[in-house]
Amino acid sequence: MNESRIFVAYRTDSFEIQALRADAEVRNLPVIFGKIDDMVDSIPAPVLFWRSGNFTAATLLARDRWLCQQSARTTIINFEAYRQTNVFSKSMQHAIMTAHVSFLPAALKSIPTFTAETIDNFHRKVTRLGISFPVIAKPDYGARGEGIVILTQPADVEHLPEALSEYVFQAYVANKGDYRVLVVGGVVHDCIHRQASSASNNAHLNNISQGGVAERVAEGALRQRLIGYATKVASCFKATLCGVDILEDDAGALYFLEVNFNPQWEGLQSCSPYSVATHLLDELTDAHDRTITPPTIASIHAYYQRVAPFLSQTARIHYFTRMYLWTGDASYRTAIEADTEAWWSSVARDIQKISDPSSETESAASAGKAYRAAAKLKHPLIAAYNAVFFKVLFDQTVFSGRHYRQELDHINRDLLRSTHQALLSDPTSLFTLSTPAVNFLYLCDYFFAVEDPSFRIDPSKLLDIAQAETVLGEDNDRDARIYFCTHAIIGASAFYSRPVSPDAIPLYHEMLAHTERTILADYVHASLDHKCEFIVCAKIIGYESALYHTILHEVRASFSTHGNYVTNVHNTYSNNVTHDTADGMEHTNVLAVMAFLADYRFVPRVK
């Protein structure tokens, strides 16, 4: 075996350690395993994976002090998470989640949670929080469902086996099980539904270790929600590896339960077709390689190819359709053929949404960025139209029209025309909505301009709107202006599927020059997504930007510590904290590959 690169430290020879050891031996990986109790002064490899979660507050403090000493010369998996105050404490986890409530999904609820030093303090908090019995008492540093007690009446708190200060208390949520979502290196490895066995004495516990029964969550809307929630939670805690537990109540509402930074995965592995040990050791190997050679744009491409099975379906389809359309390489199309049936099966449902404007008005009011809310209410059907048009477009441009071109026959032309004209007559809303509005106009042009010239787009009018003064606020104005212009160019290319008309290229050059000035005027606040999409558009129309090498340098310096993908490290973009995951940053990363690695198959013909 080669010189050891990875050290796995453990306390007990668990299923997880055995799985890691077996996978390392089969693949002849340079990994060594050692007992935590035998470690004295130094770590015998450049990368450390600490596999133990049995801690008290005192032992955690000692461990974290030792890890900090080692971190100067060793890459420690989950070190960023460990550095946060008391992150293993369940009460602290709920405090952190409460602090991040502004950018976590409103649909992921929190459970009323508190700690108490005395019995009187316990009763006061129960009253103040309006909690009814039963109440759940959990060891604040517990794991595997051990030591959890149900307090069915107020007097039960006097009979807990440990001191009150050792517990965290939560309102009891009647449930039909919970979900364990395993996040590895910025992506969700898999997710399972766990439910207490009816034969178990612990009918309130869903943990597999306490007799719970596990079932893999199938592809679908619920799985997409769980992936989105779990990756954002992992990002909040800056975790490379974690198990995110989400409770489902009897009505189907989802609640954040806890995060486990040393998750067991035997139950999940029994349901998953993918090896957790293989995935984790791949991430540890990448972490080692980053200590030797800085990752490159090619590293992004290799990473997303490798983790494709673990991306959300939305991210996976987005990545591989863009790579196929950009390069013409049929292997990218092949990679997502298995996803297409489920994706396209919703077209009829999307068309139904168009015929029910009231439901779309309601959803428009509650979704997306706040500054767009009024414009969405004025033009509520745009998102529903786009959902249909994009699926039909990619059916044609990626899969040669195998499925759903005929679905457009079900689109009411009068309603579409009135929606289109209303948007064109409202330049303020058009600019405010930016990306979805511009996409809608170009999709209408693509599908309907031949039969009805009123759908033909005039890019000079879009340029006038982009150059006009706006009052959205500095950050919102920048974001809207950049995406307004870049999506006009992407739309002109039929979303990467054809060359832009040579006659229109000079006008689009002017539009991109305006975008370049916008980015340059506020470079530190512009996101990597803004910048990479700008360079992609420059390649589409043959525009030579003075910012090319500046943006390339920023991309190369912006790799996450959790995997070979880039994130917003060197700018102040406000969404950074919730998107430091491979799934959340997929859009930016595929743009980076398109901008700086892959060649565009339609060479611009500049006139």
Language model: regions and residue ranges:
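Eukaryote-skewed repeat-based solenoidal scaffolds used as protein-protein interaction platforms
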Residues: 368-529, 539-541, 548-556
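Conserved N-proximal alpha/beta basic substrate-recognition cap immediately N-terminal to
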Residues: 11-113
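Accessory, usually C-terminal, subdomains that scaffold auxiliary metal cofactors
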Residues: 199-207, 222, 500-589
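Rossmann-like NAD(P)H-binding beta-loop-alpha module
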Residues: 108-132
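Terminal, non-catalytic domain-edge segments
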Residues: 290-349, 353-356, 384-425, 457-460, ...
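Glycine-rich phosphate/pyrophosphate-binding beta-alpha loops
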Residues: 260-273
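Phosphate-binding site of ATP-dependent enzymes
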Residues: 144-234
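A long amphipathic alpha-helix within ATP-dependent nucleotide-binding catalytic cores
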Residues: 202-256, 277-288
